[in-house]
A protein has these predicted regions:
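C-terminal regulatory/interaction module of P-loop NTP-utilizing enzymes
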Residues: 1-213
């Protein structure tokens, strides 16, 4: 709808500033400069989306600072350029706050340069519609999966992560393919949430309240 080029970067520990900005490469005619996704978005007035930004090192994300404040510039030290962001340029980052710890989290100086939106799980009726549409299952089964997810999410204090809408969609697809519902609950909802056998069995006890043997 925005009709803008979108550059998506999956952040990780080994991501460097050069991966975002660009680097010199060797070609048949010598060295040449190759723009990174951030630089291309800046030049074109596109959208640069950094997924799971807290996975990137803090010394990498500081390259965003002059772009994310009122300067709207990107210095390219290796070429000597000082790029002014083209009209329409957008910088979008995302992360799951539950993953943060003492070692992983956004620098305060980085976070304060962004407008923040907090997203929670969809309302049950909306989530049911999403699961129905994405996994092609009926309303009754989708409602059971969403209710089960709600029960599991209430156990979030005992789990590193709780059942996501994505997992419900996977479960719906596997049930519609013919796999027994309880086996699907184990494979798609219990096992992915914990490596501890006792915890998995406790989650399965909850699942048995919604799906018969």
């Amino acid at each position: 709808k925005l009709n803008k080029p979108l550059y998506t970067v999956a952040c990780h520990d080994d991501l460097t500033a050069a991966d975002l900005v660009g680097r010199h490469l060797i070609g048949p005619n010598g060295t040449y400069w190759q723009d990174g996704p951030l630089t291309r978005a800046v030049r074109e007035g596109g959208i640069c989306y950094l997924d799971e930004i807290v996975e990137a090192r803090k010394d990498t994300t500081v390259v965003l600072h002059p772009l994310a404040d009122d300067r709207r510039i990107l210095p390219l030290e290796r070429t000597g350029e000082l790029l002014q962001a083209a009209p329409g340029f957008m910088l979008v980052v995302s992360y799951n706050p539950g993953y943060q710890n003492l070692l992983k989290g956004m620098k305060a100086s980085t976070r304060q340069r962004f407008v923040a939106l907090r997203f929670s799980y969809p309302e049950p009726m909306l989530e049911q519609q999403i699961v129905m549409q994405e996994s092609q299952i009926d309303a009754e089964l989708a409602a059971k999966l969403v209710d089960l997810a709600g029960a599991l999410r209430r156990l979030e204090s005992d789990l590193d992560e709780v059942a996501s809408t994505r997992l419900l969609i996977y479960a719906g697809r596997m049930i519609s393919s013919g796999m027994p519902p309880l086996q699907v609950c184990r494979c798609c909802l219990a096992e992915p949430l914990s490596d501890d056998l006792l915890t998995v069995e406790a989650l399965m006890e909850v699942a048995r309240l919604y799906f018969a043997e």
